[in-house]
């Protein structure tokens, strides 16, 4: 009987559930909700898939079935509704590729509980009415492009989640934020542009568990009221400008599990309160100004898993109680002032996997106890004064799980051990650079089949490069530069599997600390945050290698950098090198190479740095988009080369003797050819005459063909001028040729990204710059004309104006206004004589002008224009040093040689944003990234990248960011312009530059924000 009752109950429950489901599916929108959704839809730039939009009849009324919408009946919500309509309670439209504005009509959805629009491209401001929805529980607008001030009048009594992470809100965080949020659990305002201090009223959010304020411009100290948030489990304050001491009241946050205060300006001692924080598993305080010893409570924390105190001024001995710290997995204490020996008890921290002790002066050896360090996977002792490399390697080989080992700048002038019994079976990354080590490449490395990255550069290693390196199938980065290796390049290196195809690509190890490479007393270091940041590279430069360059190098399609500079290589440059389709840098300079430069190299569409200087090459220099951008220095020291970067090429006259002999041998062939040609010509003329007579007799003339012919004839002789009010003031191609001496090399004033630029003085005395776009532009004449006319309409005081265009042979000529002071690149990097370089006021004015020009292209010009190649050489200066952007929009006029390279990917190494490596679509935020690099050039006076340099900072961005985290900003700035009077202004510009360089495009500012920020910087007199 009991069983029967259960069955009856189950049947009834199932029946009721079915009724509820049926009723839910049949619900239709309340008329007010329907209008609100219509208003929301009209604010978007495109329709939503799954929404039944009908222009003629408005919406389909059955909106409760639409994608992303959940409804409840008005009765179930306790509403008095005789029609029992469906009320919208959830709007879940995250990751729907939405763009446009968030309509204020959404605020009319008065029963809405969840509004989730995360990861779209919505923009504009947030209406204050949206923050007065009394039933709203979740508001997630994260990862969009919303901007403006955040509304200060907030009345959301039911709200549990407020997430506006990764937008562009600015101004103060509203002081009243927490006044009417009694149920709030999560507040995430990170990755915006909020400034000022953390409001005192934050303490009123008594129920909050997650508080994210990271990556803003917040300053001042942490308000004491924040430490009243006893429910707080996550506090994220990193990447701001917060300062002052860290209060001991921190211990009141007893539920805190994650605390990140890194990259701020906190100072003083770290409070000794960690025994009270017995749930804290993540603590990062790196890149602050903390001093004193590590708190004992921190060294005895049973809960800590990740501990990062890198880049402070902490002192004393490193002490960790591994008996207590049973959960510790990652330890980063690098760049501090600790003293004493390496803690020998660390292997007793049984879960510890990654250790970074870089830049700590131990002056000691690696403890014998490390043989028992079985949990260790990543270890860095870079620049830590470690001694006895033989002992170190013998001990560390016993760490069976070790995958990453960095020992740079230690063991000075010791000998790299060659004991064949050494084994590192799981090692993936080995960096022992800048140690002046003696010896050879040790055979024991062949016992590391998983090796992906090997850097033994800047040592004194000798002998030959072993062929077995080519059998390391995972190796994608090999740097043996600046040693004394001899012999041929092993042929086996041309078959490295990880460089042949993407199918053989390997997953990079990801330790929790940065790598520092090639750092010694002569130059700053180059930082890589992950092994995957290293470009696929073979660098054998600055050795004594001989023999030829293997043609099979062309099989390495994934290789980005091939540097064979400063060796004794001979023979020809193989044409097969054009197969390295991903190559960005090719340096073969300072060798004994002969023959010509293979024309096939023009197919290397990504090639940004190229040098064959100081060899024995001859013949014409290839022409093409990439080769026209390389400086003359790339080809100097080769007397036999000719072309646009060297002396003009001429047809060599044969000697009289040789000519006479050839003439006697071929006289019969010449007579035969002449007779045959004559007869053929007579025949063709006869046929042509008959066709003309036949056509004329019929009176047939194709007007369209005649118009095309006339247009081509006109285009080849005349110059189309824009904005020319004087119709009598015409310009002909003859005028252009005369003004440039038929494009004589002496008139070249620049090598732009799309062709050579010539200076010309027109018959009326006007100076102009003429850009010669060589080769096929990939467009018909009419398409080209339409594009050029569009560009000519871009008129702004900070743009180089396009004055006209014409055809010349197979080339297109663009005529621009002339800028007397040349490029910013010249003034920052090339000017060596005359008056001093640009002062700070001028540099700031140039930055402002360039920003205004870019903002015009992005926001005011119709149609909007992406520049795609912002760099210092594309910022030209007038006689009064007013900045003018050049080369905007030219990417649409040029098609590269390879079809796999789109016009969107045009750019210059050092300026290309990181996301362009994964996508083929250029964006406005990509231009902003490149502008950030230019700001760094203005601040530092340094080029963004010079991969071919054997020393120095190759990557300006990495160097600046590292110096910034170490609070060494004053060392970043160009000494010519840096002084205390301008320090604050320069720091502000540096902050703007770093904003532009954010890895996530959505976190970068708009160009209008750039203009506003730069204009608000007051220049000291």
Swiss-Prot record:
Transmembrane regions listed in the UniProt entry: 673-693
GO CC terms, sorted: plasma membrane
Residue ranges of domain Protein kinase in the record: 743-1014
Membrane topology: Single-pass type I membrane protein
Location of the protein in the cell: Cell membrane
SUPFAM superfamilies reported for this sequence: L domain-like, Protein kinase-like (PK-like), RNI-like
Signal peptide: 1-24
BP GO terms, sorted: defense response; response to other organism
GO molecular function: ATP binding; protein serine kinase activity; protein serine/threonine kinase activity
EC annotation from Swiss-Prot or TrEMBL: 2.7.11.1
Origin superkingdom: Eukaryota
PROSITE patterns noted in UniProt: LRR, PROTEIN_KINASE_ATP, PROTEIN_KINASE_DOM, PROTEIN_KINASE_ST
Active site residues of this protein: 869 (proton acceptor)
Top-level EC class: transferase
Family as reported in the entry's similarity comment: Belongs to the protein kinase superfamily. Ser/Thr protein kinase family.
Catalytic activity: L-seryl-[protein] + ATP = O-phospho-L-seryl-[protein] + ADP + H(+); L-threonyl-[protein] + ATP = O-phospho-L-threonyl-[protein] + ADP + H(+)
Function comment: Phytosulfokine receptor with a serine/threonine-protein kinase activity. Regulates, in response to phytosulfokine binding, a signaling cascade involved in plant cell differentiation, organogenesis and somatic embryogenesis.
Post-translational modification summary for this protein: N-glycosylated.
Gene: PSKR
Keyword annotations from UniProtKB, A to Z: ATP-binding, Cell membrane, Glycoprotein, Kinase, Leucine-rich repeat, Membrane, Nucleotide-binding, Receptor, Repeat, Serine/threonine-protein kinase, Signal, Transferase, Transmembrane, Transmembrane helix
Tissue expression as described in the entry: Expressed ubiquitously in leaf, apical meristem, hypocotyl and root.
Pfam families, alphabetized: LRR_1 (PF00560), LRR_14 (PF23598), LRR_8 (PF13855), Pkinase (PF00069)
Protein name from the UniProt record: Phytosulfokine receptor 1
Keyword Nucleotide-binding attached: yes
Binding sites annotated in the UniProt record for ATP: 749-757, 771
